[in-house]
Structure formats: structure tokens, C-alpha cells
């Protein structure tokens, strides 16, 4: 997964370096992330995390309304979560991450100074920090990455729709679904060869994102 993230970052840099017509943006917005836990045949919500993202984007116009969007964004999420059968994942959770989207899009004029767009593709996520505090007590705070309860990496597939106003402001709303199981060996255990066991546990994370960007 680290190699895949490196490839995504390298691809983003190549796109930035080879574009004949491109537009830089800075943006921020709101994130609502839901956590779906599957244990055996049962499936439940672990709870929602809310927060924000901020960063810069790079939009490459390929002509005829088609383009590619990439960038680098920091995200912060926090909320109260609970998995009754997994006490280590119950409490106040806080996460910091970097996000690299690589999405293909299409835009069309819909009025004077106004255009609509849609884009689809993956966002590569690298977690910087993930901690949980049972009962909200700082002394009981646990590093979820250090203990391998959760994975740092995810690939979220999703789509965004929105509008660009006067080629200066972009408003968007999107949905991303996390394709990779986020439970680590600290939850599932390890086999003799060091690989993570398959115990029928899985955690997939999806999110709704609403954002505003300033275009340059």
C-alpha cells in the first residue's frame, strides 16, 4: 500500500509537470465519515466522525470539457465510536490524514459565468495519526496505528458534482467509499508467518464531503 501511495503521488506530480493548461486551487470543506463494521454475519455502524479538510488542488484541462483533478489535502476527523464486542474501539476517536485524489472529470457551461461538473476516481488516503480515548480520559488514550488496530492506508472510490462560478469559485459535494478493510493485526491477530488472520472481521469507511475552493 505504501508503494501504491508513492505511485499516486508520483503520478500527481507528473500530471502537474506535463499540463499545457492547468488551474491551481485552494480549498476546504466539511467531512462526515461513517464506519461500517462487519463481524461474522452481523453488520453495524461503529459511529460517525465529523471534521474538515484543507489543501490545494491542480485541475488539468484536456479539452472538450474533459479534465483531470489531483492535489494534496489534510483532513481532521473526530467523534465518539463504539463496537460492543471490541472494547479497544470504543471512546472518543481523533484522526489526522493526508489525501491524494486522482479523478477524471467532465464540465459543461450552464449559464453566464456558470458551469457544472462531475468527476470520478480514487482518493489515496494515508493516516498520520489515529487515537482513541475510552470514556474521554486522556490517560487512557491509545494509538490505534502503533498497536495495529487500524490500517493507515485506504483507497476511496467516489464521485463529486458541483459548479464553478465566474471561473473563481468552486462548490462541490461528493461521496467516497473506502475499498480496503481498515482492521489491522491488532484486531484480527497474526498467523505464524506474520500475515494478518482472516477472522471474518472487517471495517469499511465511507464519507460525504462538501467543499468550497478558490481558483487561481
Describe the residue ranges of each PLM region.
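Glycine- and aromatic-enriched membrane insertion/assembly motifs of diderm outer-membrane
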Residues: 25-27, 43-90, 94
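Repeated loop/turn-to-beta-strand initiation elements of outer-membrane beta-barrel proteins
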Residues: 24, 64-68, 114, 167-173
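Transmembrane beta-strands of outer-membrane beta-barrel pores
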Residues: 30-36, 60, 74-78, 96, ...
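Short glycine/proline- and aromatic-enriched beta-strand/turn motifs that initiate or cap beta-hairpins
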Residues: 20-60, 127-129, 135-140, 207, ...
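Predominantly the C-terminal beta-signal and adjacent terminal strand-loop region
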Residues: 73-81, 145-216
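Residues that define the transmembrane beta-barrel architecture of outer-membrane proteins
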Residues: 22, 46-52, 94-100, 151-157, ...
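Outer-membrane beta-barrel strand-turn architecture
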Residues: 20, 60-64, 108-112, 165-167, ...
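Extracellular loop and loop/strand-boundary signature of outer-membrane beta-barrel proteins
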Residues: 38-45, 85-92, 141-147, 193-200
Amino acid at each position: 500500500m505504501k508503494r501504491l501511495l508513492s505511485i499516486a503521488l508520483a503520478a500527481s506530480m507528473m500530471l502537474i509537470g506535463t499540463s499545457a493548461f492547468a488551474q491551481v486551487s485552494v480549498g476546504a470543506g466539511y467531512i462526515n465519515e461513517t464506519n461500517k463494521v462487519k463481524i461474522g454475519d452481523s453488520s453495524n455502524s461503529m459511529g460517525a466522525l465529523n471534521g474538515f479538510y484543507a489543501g490545494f488542488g491542480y485541475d488539468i484541462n484536456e479539452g472538450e470539457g474533459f479534465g483531470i483533478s489531483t492535489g494534496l489535502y489534510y483532513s481532521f476527523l473526530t467523534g465518539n465510536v463504539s463496537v460492543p464486542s471490541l472494547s479497544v474501539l470504543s471512546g472518543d476517536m481523533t484522526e489526522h490524514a493526508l489525501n491524494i485524489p486522482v479523478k477524471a472529470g467532465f464540465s459543461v457551461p450552464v449559464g453566464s459565468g456558470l458551469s457544472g461538473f462531475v468527476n470520478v476516481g480514487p482518493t489515496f488516503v494515508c493516516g498520520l495519526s489515529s487515537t482513541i480515548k475510552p470514556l474521554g480520559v486522556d490517560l487512557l488514550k491509545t494509538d490505534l496505528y502503533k498497536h495495529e488496530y487500524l490500517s493507515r492506508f485506504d483507497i476511496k472510490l467516489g464521485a463529486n458534482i458541483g459548479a464553478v462560478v465566474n471561473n473563481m469559485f468552486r462548490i462541490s459535494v461528493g461521496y467516497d467509499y473506502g475499498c480496503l478493510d481498515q482492521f489491522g493485526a491488532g484486531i484480527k491477530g497474526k498467523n505464524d508467518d506474520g500475515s494478518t488472520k482472516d477472522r471474518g472481521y472487517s471495517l469499511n469507511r465511507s464519507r460525504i464531503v462538501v467543499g468550497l475552493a478558490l481558483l487561481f
